[in-house]
């Protein structure tokens, strides 16, 4: 599938992705997938650009795979949010007009939200001094953004080191803090649809939810309103801190969050070894009816996959349908697919986000 931005080809490309997902899930008797499309442009809420010197000036640049010495200079980026496209020329004019901002600048990162927040990270091959900080303060004020300066071993924050997102799920607005440098869903509109699908698939439950790989609480917040109690795990300290803030900010008080990997939690549930991070949490007090997983591209490792088998319901969000199919193959003797969906997080690429609800046979 072409990675070229061409809205006229969008519908055909989405149909091809849906056909591929049907093909991968057909051996498991999957129902027809729900298909959630993306805006055709301005859908990507974050972007990262290297800078390239040409004509005595630094320009935004991207590179084709395997061609890191052949820059493609760009002035706008139609797949990025309108806020990013509005900021790009203003930021470029600012560094071109101020040597304190321009000197040894090599990379720019944007993070925006559907709520209108924006953060810009400027990366340098030099130490950041007071003159840079003064220029960055003025820049932040003029552009109405937070500015993060990064150089080797140092980070300078002008404003906040996070952006704020608001997402509407089933009639309720959830507020999320998205830290600089941490993972966030890039396509906000599709993320909102994906959360709505997961919320509906979860259903109203009177038992408990186990969530693996919870990140900043993207799914945790809405799903917690559908369960009695939630035990959520995440390994990234930055994401854990953001998730704890987001739970408190949204008044969600039925979630315990622990910094464990999925593999470590498997050991804890199987009573292989105790974990200090689980002190005060009685795993046997939970009545888990559903496990929610959103693993990395490699999918669930075999032990985690076996762990999920003990649950009546498995709600699985996947960024790689190939490994999703491999995991389902491991589970198909005990679970069947009740519903499935395609979420077009990454238009004009071959990448697919999908979801399945597996229930015990």
Swiss-Prot record:
Catalytic residues, per the record, are: 319, 353
Q: Name one GO molecular function term.
A: rRNA binding
Annotated residues for binding of S-adenosyl-L-methionine = 185, 213, 218, 234, 294
Q: Which CDD domains match?
A: AdoMet_MTases (cd02440)
The biological processes this protein is annotated with in GO are: tRNA methylation
Q: What is its EC number?
A: 2.1.1.-, 2.1.1.35
Catalysed reactions, semicolon-separated: uridine(54) in tRNA + S-adenosyl-L-methionine = 5-methyluridine(54) in tRNA + S-adenosyl-L-homocysteine + H(+); uridine(341) in tmRNA + S-adenosyl-L-methionine = 5-methyluridine(341) in tmRNA + S-adenosyl-L-homocysteine + H(+)
* Keyword terms of this UniProt record: Methyltransferase, S-adenosyl-L-methionine, Transferase, tRNA processing
Is the keyword Electron transport assigned to this protein?
no
InterPro entries named among the record's database cross-references: MeTrfase_TrmA_AS, MeTrfase_TrmA_CS, SAM-dependent_MTases_sf, TrmA_MeTrfase, U5_MeTrfase_fam
Give yes or no: UniProt keyword Methyltransferase.
yes
Q: What class of enzyme is it?
A: transferase
Recorded GO CC terms? cytosol
Provide the family line. Answer: Belongs to the class I-like SAM-binding methyltransferase superfamily. RNA M5U methyltransferase family. TrmA subfamily.
- What this chain does, per the record? Dual-specificity methyltransferase that catalyzes the formation of 5-methyluridine at position 54 (m5U54) in all tRNAs, and that of position 341 (m5U341) in tmRNA (transfer-mRNA).
Xref: HAMAP family:
RNA_methyltr_TrmA (MF_01011)
- What name does this protein carry? tRNA/tmRNA (uracil-C(5))-methyltransferase
Lineage, broadest ranks = Bacteria, Pseudomonadati, Pseudomonadota, Gammaproteobacteria, Pseudomonadales
Q: Which gene encodes it?
A: trmA
